[in-house]
């Protein structure tokens, strides 16, 4: 039933996007690109990533098979890697990330390539965190943040900031953790993130303050 709903949702998005694309190109002001199609697909599929990663894998592989732009293709591949991670297929996720990184290393630098690097290093940071490699996760998340700053999509800066804060807290650097949680709040404000979606930041800050207070009490 959920798959039927998702298919209907995708078709509806597609119809609206096509109407918009035709109206824009008829006036000679805009031509739909492969990255436009990817972003449309991403907005449609992202809610299913944690709920039904197998479905995301199938649909994303299908999108990749018809992608004619290499940058768009590797954005799909990185999304596929995320789905593999949710399925706990870490070998497949790593293989996809490695392929995407090789492409980025050989590509002409651009904001879209920086976005890809940011996604890759953010995922690598999550993998390191799962494996208990806290110092390595900090390095990866910092790279992800730096690349995202140079990218075209800054909407994820608050998420990477939270990941960095969590990583610093796990290493015992509560001061840096608090700093990155506050940065995350600042990005939430600038991006107008709803209050109900800021819980990880508030919870993280509360945990830091509790840990610091406990440390002071035991001294």
Predicted feature residues:
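Conserved alpha-helical positions within TPR/SEL1-like repeat arrays
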Residues: 78-86, 115-130, 156-170, 197-207
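Conserved small/polar residues in nucleotide/adenosyl-binding loops
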Residues: 215-219
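Amphipathic alpha-helical segments of tetratricopeptide repeats
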Residues: 61-65, 98-109, 143-147, 182-190
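N-terminal leader/linker segments that initiate helical-solenoid repeat arrays
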Residues: 24-75
């Amino acid at each position: 039933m959920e798959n039927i709903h998702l298919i209907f949702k995708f078709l509806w998005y597609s119809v609206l996007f096509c109407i918009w694309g035709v109206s824009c190109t008829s006036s000679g002001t805009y031509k739909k690109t492969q990255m436009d199609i990817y972003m449309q697909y991403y907005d449609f599929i992202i809610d299913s990533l944690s709920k039904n990663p197998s479905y995301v894998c199938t649909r994303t592989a299908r999108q990749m098979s018809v992608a004619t732009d290499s940058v768009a293709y590797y954005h799909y591949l990185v999304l596929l890697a995320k789905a593999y991670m949710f399925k706990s297929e870490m070998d497949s996720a790593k293989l996809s990330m490695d392929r995407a990184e090789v492409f980025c290393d050989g590509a002409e630098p651009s904001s879209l390539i920086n976005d890809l690097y940011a996604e890759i290093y953010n995922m690598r940071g999550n993998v390191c965190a799962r494996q208990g490699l806290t110092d390595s996760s900090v390095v990866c998340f910092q790279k992800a943040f730096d690349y995202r700053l140079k990218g075209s999509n800054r909407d994820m800066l608050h998420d990477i900031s939270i990941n960095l804060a969590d990583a610093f807290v796990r290493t015992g650097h509560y001061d840096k953790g608090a700093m990155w949680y506050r940065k995350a709040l600042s990005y939430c404000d600038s991006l107008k993130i709803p209050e109900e979606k800021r819980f990880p930041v508030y919870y993280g800050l509360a945990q830091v303050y509790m840990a610091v207070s406990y440390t002071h009490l035991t001294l």
